[in-house]
Amino acid sequence: MAQSSTSHDSGPQGLMRRPSRSAATTVSIEVFDHEVVPASLGTIAPILRVAAEIEHERPRVAYLCRFYAFEKAHRLDPSSGGRGVRQFKTLLFQRLERDNASSLASRVKKTDGREVESFYQQYYEHYVRALDQGDQADRAQLGKAYQTAGVLFEVLMAVNKSEKVEAVAPEIIAAARDVQEKNEIYAPYNILPLDSAGASQSVMQLEEVKAAVAALGNTRGLNWPSGFEQHRKKTGNLDLLDWLRAMFGFQRDNVRNQREHLVCLFADNHIRLTPKPEPLNKLDDRAVDTVMSKLFKNYKNWCKFLGRKHSLRLPQAAQDIQQRKILYMGLYLLIWGEAANIRFMPECLCYIFHNMAYELHGLLAGNVSIVTGENIKPSYGGDDEAFLRKVITPIYRVVQTEANKNANGKAAHSDWSNYDDLNEYFWTPDCFSLGWPMRDDGDLFKSTRDTTQGKKGSFRKAGRTGKSNFTETRTFWHIYHSFDRLWTFYLLALQAMIILAFERVELREILRKDVLYALSSIFITAAFLRFLQSVLDVILNFPGFHRWKFTDVLRNILKIVVSLAWCVVLPLCYAQSVSFAPGKLKQWLSFLPQVKGVPPLYIMAVALYLLPNVLAAIMFIFPMLRRWIENSDWHIFRLLLWWSQPRIYVGRGMHESQIALIKYTIFWLLLFCCKFAFSYFLQVKLLVKPTNAIMSIRHVKYKWHEFFPNAEHNYGAVVSLWLPVILVYFMDTQIWYAIFSTICGGVIGAFDRLGEIRTLGMLRSRFQSLPGAFNTYLVPSDKTRRRGFSLSKRFAEVTAARRTEAAKFSQLWNEIISSFREEDLISDREMDLLLVPYTSDPSLKLIQWPPFLLASKIPIALDMAAQFRTRDSDLWKRICADEYMKCAVIECYESFKHVLHTLVIGENEKRIIGIIIKEVESNISKNSFLSNFRMAPLPALCSKFVELVGILKNADPAKRDTVVLLLQDMLEVVTRDMMQNENRELVELGHTNKESGRQLFAGTDAKPAILFPPVATAQWHEQISRLHLLLTVKESAMDVPTNLEAQRRIAFFTNSLFMDMPRAPRVRNMLSFSVLTPYYSEETVYSKNDLEMENEDGVSVVYYLQKIFPDEWTNFLERLDCKDETSVLESEENILQLRHWVSLRGQTLFRTVRGMMYYRRALKLQAFLDMANETEILAGYKAISEPTEEDKKSQRSLYTQLEAVADLKFTYVATCQNYGNQKRSGDRRATDILNLMVNNPSLRVAYIDEVEEREGGKVQKVFYSVLIKAVDNLDQEIYRIKLPGPAKIGEGKPENQNHALIFTRGEALQAIDMNQDHYLEEALKMRNLLEEFNEDHGVRAPTILGFREHIFTGSVSSLAWFMSNQETSFVTIGQRVLASPLKVRFHYGHPDVFDRIFHITRGGISKASRGINLSEDIFAGFNSTLRRGNVTHHEYIQVGKGRDVGLNQISLFEAKVACGNGEQTLSRDLYRLGHRFDFFRMMSCYFTTVGFYISSMIVVLTVYAFLYGRLYLSLSGVEEAIVKFAAAKGDSSLKAAMASQSVVQLGLLMTLPMVMEIGLERGFRTALSDLIIMQLQLAPVFFTFSLGTKVHYYGRTILHGGSKYRATGRGFVVKHEKFAENYRMYSRSHFVKGMELMVLLICYRIYGKAAEDSVGYALVMGSTWFLVGSWLFAPFFFNPSGFEWQKIVDDWDDWNKWISSRGGIGVPANKSWESWWEEEQEHLLHSGFFGKFWEIFLSLRYFIYQYGIVYQLNLTKESRMGKQHSIIVYGLSWLVIVAVMIVLKIVSMGRKKFSADFQLMFRLLKLFLFIGSVVIVGMLFHFLKLTVGDIMQSLLAFLPTGWALLQISQVARPLMKTVGMWGSVKALARGYEYIMGVVIFMPVTVLAWFPFVSEFQTRLLFNQAFSRGLQIQRILAGGKKQK
């Protein structure tokens, strides 16, 4: 795309774009020619590329190339059947017609054939040969030259054929042969040029690479197929992987890819060995064994689990063992590299490898087949795609067919088999029934292989693949099913507390026999709960019964029978033992007599029942025993485990060490002490007295028709009282967890030394230790250091004598500061103040600190010295009191001497200066300086010197005379004013000068006295600039750098060096790693149009960012040397810089790539410090980082060696899956991605290429995984690996990652999202972090290294700030506690670093089943933990992360996370963790994953339970009876219980961890002020609103499914959202629920009789009204310009238009209410039976309003004369509903029949209906005493009923449509939406009347910006003023 910059007005050169219906049509002006080629014509792209390249040189040859391309396109697709082919041919033909005449005119030779031939010869001789024979050939240029020559020869042959020229000159044929051979050799490569031409490359000269390549090349003793044998003899460079390809039919590029992969792995492990291998260029067996053990650990475990012997059989001969091991590893990686989506099924890969490795062994051992009697041959082999076609594709087809049954996420999980189901088939020995070669009739293939019967080809119905060990059923029962031990524990504890409370037992009496007997009834409850779990095991997993084995069925039946037996035995024994059991029952149980001396039968039964729990307790206390038993093959242990849990491959032996167990057990025991003390004393015990009182009330006067008027004990009232309390009891552990984790995280963070350096002042105080810290942690050392906590961190001070160490510090520090300047965080002046001299002056005997530490020290020292009158030692002591002042004084003095020595060259002058300096230093050494020198003139001397330095800095030759005068002045000041005694030598020299007749320092042209201007070297310029700063900066540099982000980064980085981290190894010895970034189609780089585009307020992105980042904008202008924005826009280069500047402040791929490429920059710098000698280090890294052309070409230069090491250790792959399509369609993003590759040569892009290929006359799509890099401003293909089908068949993001995973390298892999950023100073610590893989972290080595993130989007608005704080606390304090002590950290986002080999052999770094793995990342953590991994968390390194900044984007994000958690609740992974963890770790797992969402749901349910309970009490009349009873008895506790309930809003607790983390890192005063500001900015409103989002989407996902990936905006949000948009977004999740709660509160206010004056009542009602207000109005509070009158008017018009608009096919939801309404209930169409049942059941609650309120009406008082209220009243009230329905139906039918043609008739109909309604209401007023109050109450009664009917109708949609009522339902729904819209909109409108509300809201919303002096009003009100 180098030629892609052709502008629109480029005239005839560009092809004009034609409009087309198809989005995939392939042509665009910007990137035509060689890039935009239809998918089916990919092979002609190189020809068009060559044409574009040579066009300026030989237009005719370019024309002939295009003509040949046109012919070839016609040959490939004669009928133009491929997509976009016809348009492409047309445009190409038009171009040919246009260019023909002009190119013919410029032809040099007579014929076209001669023209091409002469150009070919010229190109070959003058370019190709010249390049090839050069001393230092550029490999990339050579490769490209050979490819071009190959294309030209192809064109030459075609032209000769058309001109019927038969003979081609022999020298051309010879050249073509040479080109063809070299083309194969100079193939594009990724990191290592593993062909014969690449041997001279620097990376191939590394000893470890040589060793690995040599080991792969050892093909001794292998038999090659005949075709390969000839090739091998000819080239001699085939290796072991080529042999595997020949035998098993792998793809060529797969082999090339895995060859490099294997070489990198071997080289990496080989160089790290200790002791070092001898010789270094021979691959050590230890390196091979290390890689092999990692690669095959899972495979060996799998074989052991299935009781099979593994196939890794080694030969007897020692010399062949290494070769055999490499063959096995190569085979596995080749299988993995071609497995595509099957990589998500690791045990399926184990099965394939098991059989192929067995065949490999047979091949090499010469085994004979038992069946055929011949030598064993591979079952699948032959051509290059045999393995893909015969092994992978059949399995892929099964996976694809099952995925298609998912119906795009709409089908139930039980209807199809996901990746896990299919993989788990290979956890059973049944998988071997597939055989090898695999039989098509094996179980796995039943779903797709229909077997033909008979000649007519009738089909047998396909068998079902079926679910495996688990079925994801949509039900809330999963919450109990997955965490049954937790709920059992809570229920038993609750039962025990209730027993103690009602028995009024004091805690000290708990060991009384009768109390213990009463408490022992909990075991009966436990037995029933266990029975429930056994039943759920069968019911929830029943859809997978096809795959159940007999042992599974037996186990389930036995468990149900045994648990049922206990449910009978325990109650019977208990009843027989207790005294209060009925006498008849005791007689009936007389067959259970007690024998004397034997304990009671119940006690024995309980002991027997608890026996298995004793065993479990022993295994809990000794986790090592549990691990051993779970991994054991002993049958007794298998039987034991078979009963307690099904035997599955994962989840075994994952228990932690004894110490870890003790830590998290203590955490939970302390938490439970607090939780149960609170629950018992403040919840359960307080309700005992009110409960007894309520149950003792008789004679309740009911206000409605009571169905059970004579029922005793008022159970309804008791339930209303207890239900909210019990719900809070189940939820409040989450609150206690928040408190305890905050305290625990704070303590751990403090011990981790977080926040020790948090301000610039703290940094200054610790700066002297910094060089030591740098050299300890960032510079490798041979000394080993013990890790661990110490109270103080001390580092050996780097003294001036240790110059190399000081130089290393300066290189690292300066590179960090330079990166700050590049990012525009600091200005040029600040950079100068922060830099340390790159090249230290050998004459200085001290460390040169950065000037910002020494600023203003010299002026202060001068003032001090000028006024000092006492002894020298006192003055020096005062100066030395400030270490930096001492350094500044010494450095300035030494620099003063250095300047004079450099400047003065006259003999006499040099002697004079020497005498003065000698005199000064002599006096200093004798402590007599102050007595012999006057100090008062010192400032005058200094000012002269400052002037001199200023002149030297600019080095203007015209100022020579001024320099002479200054030197004379300075000499005079010293000799006349300062020296008290005359120096004899000076006098003599003065006399000598008089005699010569010239003045001092003046000199002559022949004999100058001074050298001015001095010789300008970089070192001289640096020294003079620094000296000038030290002398002139008078103000303190306390606030340097001024930028807050720069301050934060420096503070965190320096603080992290005082934390505990591993020492860094040398770069060559470090673990190599890759970074993988999934990218779909988000923003890459903002275009110029994006920058200039204004929103509705006239604000452009550039203007916005100028106001948000004013200091960075100023620094940017300074860097470009521009005055303002106008001058920036004058140059194309500056516009590009501006685009980059803006893109680096958004969430773009450009920002992410820049951040990740810091890794490479850091590695090169660190490798320089490792590899450079002392001279090179003292000369500085700058000399290397700006190499000469010679250095770049030389393979021996230090520069190329650094490049080689960086290449080997770091790979960055951006997986841009749509790049191919974007390129073909001319999408700007493709050009941006190419530019990224050009600017970052080591960046690789992986994409999925869809190519149309013709097979058997049919065009079909073929998919490839392609890896590309940039060469010579074009993208160049490195590998192209064919896939069995489309890569995306499940969740898109994990499958995008998966396809690119094969192109990553190294032993660690970092997953980075494209909204992340990185910093150079953090990248420097990557080596340290990777060493954590080798550190001791408990029983198991780490498999995922987690670390913290900094949220960089928090500075814009209050919302962004809340979100930023919330996210920051989660990724720091939250995950710190999860990792230690709780040991349940998983994988939550994307800075985590994976143990790559561990994960690629166990299913990858995410899971991809549609729907269930919506939160794909956390499943990587689940999978890692279940497969005995270990996830850690580290605080000393961080990356940047962007978050959504507008309320709607935040809500979309939270909806996505809530849906993901809903799916997790149903998942097998969580079920297995819940059952395989020990009890306390299971508690941790629950409360840190789905437990938070369940607790949030319980909070909302508590509010509902409380209010509906109150509604029941008030409407039924029970509450009035209770209040009267309490008043009569004087029972205050009963009154209080009625008035208050424990209603807690969990959202407010989100601030706890935030406050702790801010306190730790920025000080507790800051934390407190931030907390207060957050409250003032309505943070509680935001968190309460978020609670509603979480609960709605979590609950809906579990009930109905329909979860999907929700793309959230990543843009800059200062945008007003329209009311209609907010309504669509929040109607169902917040507004409906808020309205319902509001109606409940109003009803209770009207009918309630509880004590309204109590504080408890006020608190509860206040908090509930706050919840309602938050849910209804938060979207308006947090909407920019939400209360601006004009916007309100526009919003209302827009909403009216939207709600009135009719829907229809193709009408989007944002244009029509009908379309939106249909979309909103779509989930009900696909919901299961239970989902629909619960939806209807929950809707029934709305009927209680009508039932209760109709009996309160004035109208019905007549019917209340009797003792009982008649049910007829309620029945008659339904007539109103029926009447309304009839009216609606009449209107609906009338509209259909009359509205179009008989408008008058329709109006008359509506008039009659209106008159009729008025007449009926009037009669009711007159005859039945109806009042206005009755009408208002009726609305409260009937509106909820109508809503209930509407909800039920939506569920019963098919029925409604059948009976013809759907139109009425729609009309009713629209009416309700109108009412809801008006109710919500009215208060907003009223507030908008007052202008100050809008101003207040803006201030509230953008306070963060205001505090930094920003003017958001101008941004909102219009940047138009700027124009």
UniProtKB/Swiss-Prot annotation:
Is the keyword Transit peptide in the record?
Answer: no
Query: Record's SMART domains?
Result: FKS1_dom1
Known catalytic reactions = [(1->3)-beta-D-glucosyl](n) + UDP-alpha-D-glucose = [(1->3)-beta-D-glucosyl](n+1) + UDP + H(+)
The enzyme's E.C. designation: 2.4.1.34
- One GO term describing the cellular component: 1,3-beta-D-glucan synthase complex
Topology class, membrane: Multi-pass membrane protein
Cite the residue spans of the region called Disordered: 1-22
User: Locations of Polar residues compositional bias?
Assistant: 1-10
Intracellular or extracellular location(s) = Cell membrane
Spans within the Cytoplasmic topological domain: 1-481, 543-559, 623-658, 741-1486, 1557-1566, 1652-1657, 1756-1766, 1825, 1895-1923
Q: Gene3D superfamilies, alphabetically?
A: Vacuolar protein sorting-associated protein vta1
Q: How does gene deletion manifest?
A: Plants develop deformed and inviable pollen grains which do not have exin.
**Which biological processes are named by the entry's GO terms?**
(1->3)-beta-D-glucan biosynthetic process; cell wall organization; microsporogenesis; pollen development; pollen germination; pollen tube growth; pollen wall assembly; regulation of cell shape
Q: Which UniProt keywords apply?
A: Cell membrane, Cell shape, Cell wall biogenesis/degradation, Glycoprotein, Glycosyltransferase, Membrane, Transferase, Transmembrane, Transmembrane helix
Q: Carries keyword Transferase? A: yes
Q: What Pfam family does this protein match (any one)? A: Glucan_synthase
Q: Which residues cross the membrane?
A: 482-502, 522-542, 560-580, 602-622, 659-679, 720-740, 1487-1507, 1536-1556, 1567-1587, 1631-1651, 1658-1678, 1733-1755, 1767-1787, 1804-1824, 1826-1846, 1874-1894
Q: Which GO terms describe its molecular function?
A: 1,3-beta-D-glucan synthase activity
**Superkingdom of source:** Eukaryota
Q: What positions does the record give for glycosylation?
A: 1710
Ranges in the topological domain labelled Extracellular = 503-521, 581-601, 680-719, 1508-1535, 1588-1630, 1679-1732, 1788-1803, 1847-1873
Family indicated by similarity: Belongs to the glycosyltransferase 48 family.
| Function as written in the Swiss-Prot or TrEMBL entry | Required for the formation of the callose wall separating the tetraspores (interstitial wall) and surrounding the pollen mother cells (peripheral wall). Required for exine formation on pollen wall. May be involved in callose synthesis during pollen tube growth. During plant growth and development, callose is found as a transitory component of the cell plate in dividing cells, is a major component of pollen mother cell walls and pollen tubes, and is found as a structural component of plasmodesmatal canals.
Q: What is this protein called?
A: Callose synthase 5
Which source organism? Answer: Arabidopsis thaliana (Mouse-ear cress)
Organismal lineage:
Eukaryota, Viridiplantae, Streptophyta, Embryophyta, Tracheophyta
Q: Which gene encodes it?
A: CALS5
